[in-house]
């Protein structure tokens, strides 16, 4: 089992729409933004429904034999190759509150318990062969009870009530989805516990800062729809290629680091950046190719596109539109003329 890989581990449902690589067409970008708007509306509707459900505790509903019969699938050989066992379980929308019976199903590799009423996942700590775990839309306030699952690669706990990540650590975890929880800080996200993590979804939480992201292996980070007003601790994200910060409270772009050498896509849409000169603070990002700044006050400044390109000549796209070759030439000429003009007083003095 040690060399087992996640063959059908599903990708994060919502992350592709935000990646925004430089190869995208304008149509791709437009379609992705439209999907994101519809998805955001859907999430808000679900949150309202869940708030109404929080008032009274759910009735006790254990996982029954009938539910197990309906949910088990994918018969495979066990680790020693001498027997067979079901390795996949899907039990959704059954109002489950108790899954203690699963402690004995040690061969399970793929588990989906989404849309139930679970508050405790600790019985799954016995499933040491688990590769993929989904428990979206439950009533979890913590995920520390899982212990360490040595082979877990995909985990999704979207739309719960998780307030803390203390004690959460799985050495082979690659993708973690925590959309729509109640996290106020990122304490507990340590490299020593999550050394393989490359995609982290934290949209729609209550984060105030980015401090605590000590995850050098991370490549994609989604922090949209939070309350972030300060960018801190980003210097540890040396392999990050995609950073999504839409719908936050950023007024300045302080906090970006020259250590972010791999960053290619940055989404700052719908923040509070008032001055276009803040863009100059992104010059330390040598591989930045796509920048989204629309719905910030600075978008209204005269020469918005041209001044951004002058400050960041490596950019290929601003918001939805790619830069034309003519724009790039004009920006380069304008920058050169300004530099020569600034140098003239010194030359005259000599």
Swiss-Prot record:
Biased composition (Acidic residues): 1-54
Localization: Cytoplasm, Cytoskeleton, Flagellum axoneme; Cytoplasm
Cellular component annotations (GO), alphabetically ordered: cytoplasm; cytoskeleton; motile cilium
Name of protein: Leucine-rich repeat-containing protein 23
Annotated LRRCT domain residues: 296-334
Coiled coil: 314-344
UniProt xrefs under SMART domains: LRR_SD22 (SM00365), LRR_TYP (SM00369)
Source organism of this protein record: Xenopus tropicalis
SUPFAM superfamilies the record matches: L domain-like (SSF52058)
């Amino acid at each position: 089992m040690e060399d087992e890989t996640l063959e059908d581990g599903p990708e994060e449902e919502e992350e592709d729409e935000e990646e925004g690589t430089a190869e995208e067409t304008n149509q791709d970008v437009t379609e992705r933004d439209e999907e994101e708007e519809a998805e955001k509306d859907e999430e808000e509707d679900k949150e309202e429904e869940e708030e109404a459900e929080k008032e009274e505790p759910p009735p006790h509903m254990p996982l029954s034999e009938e539910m197990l019969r309906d949910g088990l699938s994918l018969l495979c050989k066990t680790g020693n190759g001498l027997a067979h066992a079901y390795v996949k379980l899907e039990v959704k929308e059954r109002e489950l509150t108790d899954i203690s019976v699963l402690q004995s199903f040690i061969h399970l590799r793929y588990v989906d318990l989404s849309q139930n009423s679970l508050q405790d996942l600790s019985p799954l700590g016995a499933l040491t062969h688990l590769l993929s775990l989904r428990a979206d839309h439950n009533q979890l306030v913590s995920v520390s009870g899982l212990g360490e699952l040595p082979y877990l690669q995909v985990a999704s706990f979207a739309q719960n009530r998780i307030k803390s990540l203390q004690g959460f650590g799985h050495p082979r975890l690659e993708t973690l989805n925590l959309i729509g929880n109640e996290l106020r800080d990122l304490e507990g996200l340590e490299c020593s516990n999550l050394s393989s993590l490359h995609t982290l979804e934290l949209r729609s939480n209550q984060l105030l800062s980015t401090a605590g992201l000590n995850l050098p292996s991370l490549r994609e980070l989604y922090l949209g729809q939070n309350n972030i007003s300060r960018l801190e601790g980003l210097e540890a994200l040396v392999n990050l290629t995609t950073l999504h910060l839409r719908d936050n409270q950023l007024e300045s772009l302080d906090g970006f680091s020259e250590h972010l050498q791999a960053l290619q896509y940055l989404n700052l849409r719908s923040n509070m950046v008032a001055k276009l000169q803040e863009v100059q603070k992104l010059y330390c990002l040598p591989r930045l190719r796509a920048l989204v700044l629309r719905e910030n006050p600075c978008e209204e400044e005269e020469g918005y596109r041209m001044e951004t390109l002058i400050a960041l000549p490596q950019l290929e796209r601003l918001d939805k539109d790619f830069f034309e070759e003519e724009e790039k030439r004009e920006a380069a000429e304008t920058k050169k003329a300004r530099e020569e003009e600034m140098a003239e007083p010194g030359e005259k003095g000599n």
